[in-house]
Amino acid sequence: MNIEGDDEEFYNFNDIKKKRKFTKEDAIYGVFNDGWGDYEDEEESKMTEEEYYKMKKRYSTPVGFVASGIYEPNEHKLKNKDGENIDNDDDDGEEKKKKKKEKKEKKQKKKEKKEKKEKKNKKKNKYGGGGGNNYDDSDNDKSIEDKPVGGIGAALLSKMGYKGTGGLGRDGGGMVEPIKVQVRPKNAGLASVTELNVNSSDDSDDSDQSEGDTDSDNENKRSLGWKKKEPKLKYDFDEHLESTTTTTFKKKTTTTTATTTTSSTPQIVIDMRGPEARLYTGMEEIKHHKHHHHHQHNKEYQNITSILDDQSKPLSELKHNVDLLLKLKQIDIQNQDNKIKHENDKINNLTRGVEKLKLTIENDKEQIKKVTEILETITTVKKQLDQSQLDLKQLYKVFKKLKSNYPKEYQNFKLYNLQKELLEPLLKEKLNQWELESNSDNNDNSSLEISKKLSKEMVKWRQLFQESVSVLGEYQINVYFLIMRDLFLPKFKNYLRSQWDVKKPSNAATLISTWSDTLPDVIQEALLEQSILPKLKVAIEKWDPRTDPIPLDHWLLPWIPLLGSELESFYPLIRQKIISALQDWHPSDKSAIKILTPWKNIFQSNSMDSLLNRAIIPKLSKSIKDLEINPSNQKSPIEIQWLLRWSNLNNNDNNNNNNNNNNNDNNNNNNSITTTDNINLDSGLITLSTIICILEKDFFTRWLKILLEWLKSPDANLEEISNWYSGWKKQFPKEIISNDKIKSIFNISLNLMKKVLSNETIQKDDEILISQKINSLLNTNINNNNNNNNNINNSYQQQNQQQPIKPISSPSLNSSNNNNIDNISTKQMVEQLAIKNGLLFIPSEKKTNSGQQIYIFDKIPIIIERDLIMYNNNNNNRWEPANIQYLLDKSLNK
């Protein structure tokens, strides 16, 4: 194994080597750079690592530049140590040998450096040396001048063939000296540059020498990093005039030859006579110029202009100074003007601010005055309340005054919230004095009067608090709604659930009807659905028409204007109970008419017809069939009166004649239904067409047969027959006699009687005609009755299919335990309703800001607060009150 090679690899892996900077030459040439990879080796060969880092520190110190023109950076490449030029045509073999020697030397140096670094690392590990380069200054012996000087510019020039001396280009015949840049004084014109450009054609040698001299003189100054300020020269105008006058005469003699040579070149003339300086190429242009401005000048000004014309550089510095002074004065004037404007603007702004402050002070005074007045009124009202001298009317006037006189303060300070301190104590006193359980049968109208007065007063408060909203947690609730919820709703619920009797609806119905305009819709619906409907459901299920002394219509129909469609779900149960009660009913009993007449306009026509067809019409037709028709001993036909009183065709005379018989029949009937006597017996429940059909089928067919047999008998007495005929005809009202079928029957009987009077025999044709008539009546009646019955039954079935029983909005209606209806809570009612309809009802993990529990009713978040249900409306993100039916419809219609 090569231990040295392994050590080198381990050393290279652990060594954190400092890389050289990535130069612009590397970016341009990349790997193809000639010096790429060798630069670092050359650096390492020339200096150690400590020297390298120490030299790096010197870059923060001021730099001493080398004078240009003396140092040639690439001169060491072109000369040997003895000063002889290197031949470019040496052999390649010698160069290869030199390179091999250099590589060997480099490898040895690298090994020595690695050994030194290993020793240093061991020392650091022993003594726990930290970061930082602690080098000695003894190694820094070499000067910076030994380094090759030159940046990327020199490298690029060398690539393009520049060798350090001579001109640019491959052959050295290019440009040697670039264009010189000469400094022009600040704010000086072009005329001042002409003298600087006189010596522009001097040789480059002189310039190089001068530059070398200046550079050599200023080396020490530049190394120090600062320059001394040159002394400022003061300009004397008188001395300048004297010097210019003496020098002009000298120049005229010396420059005559020069003017002849330079006559072809244009002479620049500056005309300063006008308000603005003008440039001309010569005096001729001034003479022939069209626009001359003649001005009268003083002698001093004329002398100055003559001097300026003679001189090539006429007082440019003085001119410049005067212009500067003018500009400075203009700037001072503008600054002063701006300051004056700024101060004026400040004054205006301050005056406006003072006015605004005065207005705010006045407004604050007015507000303070209003607030003090409001406080005085509130304190006086509180004193009156404490002394029990305050009434609802007086308090209403105070609130109305506050709202009308101080509308902004009423809304900003939320003065309507004073109802908790002022209004609620008065309302509690009124509610304690109000006894809802007082019965109207005892002639005690005090509670009714109190309720009416209180409802009228609360209507006023409702209008006053219509736009007043109180914030409770996350949602906003109307103030009037809070009053009714907290004070009146518990009072009404307690009365309706515990004290109110269902079969005495006058108190509760009048209570809710009088308070319908006062109570909010949500509270009214909550009372009807949660307190009234459950008790009505229980009472309807317990109601028996045969034993209950109070009819159902007396205590159920008063709720129709308030409940409306909610009672429709009870109608099928009511019809079934009536049909079951009428199974043992006899047509002589009037109670059936009194029971069914109030439901005539409430039940639908199809359902009412089906009830009559199932319970009433068959028994009436049977009673007509059982009617005895005996000419020898004819009794009064009471059965026909039983039939006719189901319509509005009953004759009052017949009713009066048969009252005694009806009473006797009712007394003999054990299964009579008890009713009140306030309903008219001419109910009109059965139509005229059905009554005529019953008479044709069950009465007139038998009546014609008996009349025909009586006329055939030899002992027939025509007077008795005519009296018998007229007696039967009087039993029917005009509406029945005027019917075509009934007319034809009476006409046939008259024809037969006429034949007997004329001593004509009744032939077989007459008998056949009567039998055909009877058969046709029987057939038509049977068909009509069957069609009628089928239509009624079909309509009844369709009604039951089209109108399914709606789920009652109150869960207690669907619950089996109806006896505990007063003790059931709203939460239990909602839970039972959800179970009945297969909906989800669970408590949520979330709660409101006030700590109320949120429940999920089929994906609808609800809150149950004091027997009120509130749901979260997604449209406005508020908690709004809702009834159970609304939640059911919303969840089932999804």
Swiss-Prot record:
The keyword Coiled coil applies. Residues 202-217 have a biased composition (Acidic residues). GO terms for cellular component: cytoplasm; spliceosomal complex; U2-type post-mRNA release spliceosomal complex. Residues 329-449 form a coiled coil. Residues 97-126 have a biased composition (Basic residues). Belongs to the TFP11/STIP family. May be involved in pre-mRNA splicing. This is Septin and tuftelin-interacting protein 1 homolog. The lineage of its organism: Eukaryota, Amoebozoa, Evosea, Eumycetozoa, Dictyostelia.
